[in-house]
Amino acid sequence: MLATPTLSNFDKPSLPSSEGGDPALAARLQPLYSRFLTDLDLQPEYRRHESEKLMEEVLKFAKSTGVPHDLNSHSYQSLMVGYTYADNCLPYHDIEVKVYVAIYTWLATICDDAEALGIIDDVQLFEQRFILGEEQPTVLLRAFADQLKLTYKLYHPLVANLILCSSLNLLTSTSLVARKGIKEKGDHPSKGGNYFAWYIRERDGVGEAYSWFTFPKRQFPNLDIPIEAIEDMTRFIAYLNDVLSFYKESLAGETHNYINHTAAYEGVDSDAALHKTAQDTIDCARRIESVLAGKGEYEKAWRLHASGYLQMHVQRGRYRLIEVGVGDAPDVHEVIKKI
């Protein structure tokens, strides 16, 4: 029997994961972050976009899904992440594509938090139901299934296939990392399992889907042009997030992440793994630029995506980079009040 839509955990108030900062940690990370942003040197220089028309369309679409997103909720905060991503990373894409990416990001973000929200049992069987044509048991998963099907309207069939595979991997990895045995591998890594950290990160980072989001079929009909850079784009999207999330995750005591797992498998401390991941991000950026050099609108679209993605982290208060001296305070759309 299908579950009756109710006020789910993901629509409950979102509270900060930690109240205070860590001045000592911030001081230690500040030189690395400053150097990282300088060396990354993404061009063209980012210009902020805040489209009221897009906000209107995103809220309209979100309402149509039936997924709760009250203002003072985790769901609404996730929706604003989606809005910001679409508007700032895809600034001159068709509004239909922007709305699609915003809603996808919203729903995927909630699904990615499945363990904390107590919905792992629903999420881990999503793919089975999707492949067998069975209806999903909750309003959230029904909305995400519908969103995945919409991919084929906006992207080349082969690109849509890749986006779908990446999306299903996200849900599988979300369920995998909730398992006790998988969590223990981060604390007690097996010798020789060094690539396990990336194996999980590649899947839960959903970077391939976001790489291809850059190239909808109407504006970018030739998938052959960017495909050589997709692996580096996938890694860039994951690595940059890992580097710029490290401070806020450290404050929250979160150690089950790519940087800490890499450190455990490599036998180094987390600072060393952070430095390496920062350099890997820069190396990915340079290779992508080399592949797309002279490729016209394809090059422009990626450069704007990368620049907007970086600034989304710097500008959104959820990453707390203002405490490290390289970020901004929360904007009005993302402030979640305590109650």
Curated annotation (Swiss-Prot):
Question: Where on this chain does Mg(2+) 1 bind?
Answer: 112
For biotechnology, the entry says the protein is used as follows:
Longiborneol synthase CLM1 is a potential target to reduce Fusarium head blight disease. 3D-structure modeling based on known 3D-structure of losely related enzymes has been used for screening of hypothetical inhibitors of CLM1 catalytic activity.
Membrane-spanning segments: none
Q: Where is the composition biased (Polar residues)?
A: 1-17
Q: Where does Mg(2+) 2 bind?
A: 241, 245, 249
Q: Can you tell which superkingdom this protein's organism belongs to? A: Eukaryota
Which pathway does the record list?
A: Mycotoxin biosynthesis
Q: Where is this region: Disordered?
A: 1-21
Disulfide bond residue pairs:
none
| Molecular-function GO terms, alphabetical | carbon-oxygen lyase activity, acting on phosphates; metal ion binding
Q: Which UniProt keywords apply?
A: Lyase, Magnesium, Metal-binding, Virulence
Residue positions of motif NDXXSXXXE magnesium-binding motif: 241-249
Catalysed transformations (reactions): (2E,6E)-farnesyl diphosphate + H2O = (-)-longiborneol + diphosphate
> What is the required cofactor set for this protein?
Mg(2+); Mn(2+)
| Null allele phenotype | Leads to complete loss of culmorin production. Does not affect the trichothecene biosynthetic pathway since 15-acetyldeoxynivalenol (15ADON) is still produced. Keeps the ability to convert exogenously added longiborneol to culmorin.
Per the UniProt entry, the Enzyme Commission number(s) are 4.2.3.-
What upregulates or represses it? Expressed under trichothecene-inducing conditions.
Provide the family line.
Belongs to the trichodiene synthase family.
What role is this protein assigned? Terpene cyclase involved in the biosynthesis of culmorin, a tricyclic sesquiterpene diol reported to have antifungal activity and some phytotoxicity to wheat coleoptile tissue, contributing to Fusarium head blight disease. The terpene cyclase CLM1 is responsible for the cyclization of farnesyl diphosphate into the intermediate longiborneol.
Name listed for the protein in its UniProt record: Longiborneol synthase CLM1
